[in-house]
C-alpha cells in the first residue's frame, strides 16, 4: 500500500491526508437540521447537485436540486455575496472524514480517517454530541478518494509497524526485528552507495 510506504518514511496518517487533501468544515445547525459550511467556488467544478443548497444568511435556495454548476457559476454566486451555505445530511453521503472522530471511549468507538459518510455514521456522530466534521475535499476530476480509502484499510499505524510490514514483503519467512527491518529499509531507499 502507498500509505505503508509513507508511514515507513515517518509520516502519520493525519499528515498524509493533510499533504494530499484540503479539508472543508461542516457544522450541524440544529435549528434548520442542515449542515453549514463556507461556500468556496474552487470546490464546485462541474458538479451536479442531488440536493438543494441554501444561503445560510438569507435562507433562500441558491442551487436547485438537479442543477449543474461549474466554477464560473460558483464564482458568480460568491461575488454576489454568498459566504455560507446549508446542505442536507444526504449531500454529505459519499464524502470522507479528514480526521478521526471519537464517538466514545471504546476502541470501536472511533470513525477513522477516510471513513465514508452515510446515514448511520452521521447519526452516530450526532448522537455523540459532535456537531462539527472535517471532510476531505475530493472530486471526480483530479482528486479522487483513493489515498483516503488506502489509509482506512492500512492496518499499520506507526513507522515501526510499516517498516516491519515492508520487511515481511521483502524477506518473507524471516522473523523481523525492528532494528534489522529498519536497516534493510534504509539501505533500500537511502543508501548513498546504491544511488
Annotated model-derived regions:
Residues 1-195:
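N-terminal non-catalytic structural scaffold regions of very large proteins
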Amino acid at each position: 500500500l502507498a500509505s505503508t510506504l509513507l508511514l515507513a518514511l515517518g509520516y502519520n496518517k493525519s499528515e498524509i491526508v493533510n499533504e494530499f487533501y484540503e479539508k472543508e468544515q461542516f457544522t450541524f445547525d440544529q435549528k434548520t437540521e442542515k449542515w453549514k459550511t463556507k461556500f468556496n467556488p474552487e470546490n464546485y467544478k462541474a458538479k451536479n447537485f442531488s440536493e438543494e443548497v441554501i444561503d445560510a444568511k438569507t435562507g433562500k435556495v441558491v442551487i436547485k436540486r438537479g442543477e449543474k454548476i461549474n466554477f464560473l457559476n460558483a464564482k458568480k454566486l460568491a461575488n454576489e455575496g454568498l459566504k455560507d451555505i446549508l446542505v442536507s445530511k444526504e449531500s454529505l453521503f459519499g464524502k470522507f472524514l479528514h480526521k478521526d472522530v471519537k464517538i466514545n471511549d471504546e476502541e470501536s468507538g472511533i470513525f477513522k480517517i477516510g471513513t465514508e459518510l452515510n446515514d448511520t455514521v452521521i447519526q452516530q456522530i450526532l448522537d455523540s454530541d459532535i456537531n462539527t466534521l472535517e471532510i476531505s475535499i475530493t472530486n471526480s476530476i483530479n482528486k479522487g478518494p483513493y489515498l483516503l480509502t488506502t489509509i482506512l484499510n492500512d492496518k499499520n499505524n506507526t513507522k515501526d509497524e510499516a517498516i516491519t510490514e515492508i520487511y515481511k514483503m521483502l524477506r518473507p519467512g524471516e522473523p523481523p526485528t525492528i532494528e534489522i527491518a529498519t536497516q534493510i529499509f534504509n539501505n533500500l531507499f537511502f543508501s548513498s552507495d546504491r544511488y
